[in-house]
Swiss-Prot record:
Expressed in leukocytes, lung, spleen, liver, heart, kidney, muscle and uterine cervix. Down-regulated in cervical cancer. May act as a tumor suppressor. Promotes apoptosis of cancer cells. GO terms for molecular function: cysteine-type endopeptidase activator activity. This is Suppressor of tumorigenicity 20 protein. The gene is ST20. GO terms for biological process: apoptotic signaling pathway; cellular response to UV-C. It comes from Homo sapiens (Human). Keywords: Tumor suppressor.
């Protein structure tokens, strides 16, 4: 089973730039269940809003943005 190559260092660097996490399956390996689990975990959070391309002009094709409205942090999942 493939495991995540996302290190604690890379996560903390992302947090310093104002992001909670940046999960990039194209550049680092994460299992399908890890990515799906993170998305489901955030979707069931009451403050979560899922933005797709039709909701905002800032989303590019193929990007899904999960925004936590009560924080200034965004989590981006690239598929």
């Amino acid at each position: 089973m493939a495991r995540s190559r996302l290190t604690a260092t890379s996560v903390s660097q992302v947090q310093e730039n104002g992001f909670v996490k940046k999960l990039e399956p194209k550049s680092g390996w994460m299992t399908f269940l890890e990515v799906t689990g993170k998305i489901c975990e955030m979707l069931f959070c009451p403050e979560a809003i899922l933005l797709t391309r039709k909701d905002t002009p800032y989303c590019e094709t193929g990007l899904i943005f999960l925004t936590l409205t009560k924080t200034i942090a965004n989590t981006y999942f690239y598929f």
